[in-house]
From Swiss-Prot:
Protein known as: Putative glycosyltransferase 6 domain-containing protein 1
Gene Ontology molecular-function annotations: glycosyltransferase activity; hexosyltransferase activity
Source organism: Homo sapiens
Cofactor: record remark: Binds 1 Mn(2+) ion per subunit.
Chain's gene name: GLT6D1
Glycan-modified residues: N74
Tissue: Expressed in both healthy and inflamed gingival tissue samples at similar levels, with higher expression in the gingival connective tissue compared to gingival epithelium. Strongest expression in testis, followed by leukocytes.
Chief subcellular location: membrane
Length: 276
């Protein structure tokens, strides 16, 4: 009996050693903000919010540390872009070319391209890390305003398949191009972009929605930053949560005879749900 007990104890101890070794080799070490973010290098700008989220500027982050972390996580990043009419012809091709060159280079990326008509993808050098998926939005929806169609369509695709395909997702406007690397320093649960013009203005002058009956209303004397509408990012779950809140806000405003902009609803969401 003693020999059997001894054998069981030895086997149990050996099993614990195997489990410990597995987790030591496979567990991704949690990344601390101080490991890669160096706000003191840019004393000329705001580098941290009141809720201690980093505000990224060139020179404030160490991409090498982040690369080491995310390589081990084996992530996939999604980039959704929406273009209709002249936007598809004029902006979408240069956007995709620049994104293919600068967006999350070295990582798996799925481009979700949503258009209102047939769109031929530009000639882009094939890569096993790059996947392009085009979706046609039904023409019966075009009585709605553009941003509403974009957001609603994106929400449907997130719920049906995107949330199972990517770890992080960005939604961007097509009328812009990437000039430099847009890398893993931008990843986080909820990511916003400061408005380039309003950043340098007084908070009290921000063009928030001020009508009290609007779902997008931020009362006078409140608010922290003004965010631009060219980009929103985060986990698919958080993007879907924003979309639901935005659509509910639009419905609320329509019932009250109001018509606030997408950007103002976006700012209200980020006012209540702070970017990370």
């Amino acid at each position: 009996m003693n020999s059997k007990r001894m054998l069981l104890l030895v086997l149990f101890a050996f099993s614990l050693m195997l489990v410990e070794r597995y987790f030591r080799n496979h567990q991704v070490e949690e990344l601390r903000l101080s490991d890669w973010f160096h706000p003191r290098k840019r004393p000329d700008v705001i580098t941290k919010t009141d809720w201690l989220a980093p505000v990224l500027w060139e020179g404030t982050f160490d991409r090498r540390v982040l690369e080491k972390h995310y390589r081990r996580r084996n992530i996939t990043v999604g980039l959704a872009v929406f273009a209709t009419g002249r936007f598809a012809e004029e902006y979408l091709r240069p956007f995709l070319h620049s994104a293919n060159k600068h967006f999350m280079t070295g990582y798996r990326v799925i481009f979700y391209i949503m258009v209102d008509a047939f769109f031929k993808l530009p000639d882009i050098e094939p890569s096993p890390l790059r996947t392009f998926k085009a979706f046609k939005v039904g023409t019966e929806r075009w009585w709605l305003d553009g941003p509403l169609v974009h957001v609603k369509s994106l929400g449907e695709h997130i719920a049906s398949h995107i949330q199972d395909e990517v770890d992080f997702l960005f939604s961007m406007a097509a009328n812009q191009v990437f000039q430099n690397e847009f890398g893993v320093e931008t990843l986080g649960p909820l990511v916003a972009q400061l408005h380039a013009w309003w950043y340098f203005r007084n908070t009290k002058n921000f063009p928030y929605e001020r009508r009290p009956t609007s779902a997008a209303c931020i009362p006078f004397g409140q608010g922290d930053f003004y965010y631009g509408n060219l980009m929103v990012g985060g986990t698919p779950h958080n993007i879907l949560d924003f979309i639901k809140e935005y659509l509910n806000g639009v419905i609320h405003d329509i019932k009250n005879g109001l018509n606030s902009t997408y950007e103002k609803h976006l700012n209200k969401y980020f006012y209540l749900n702070k970017p990370t």
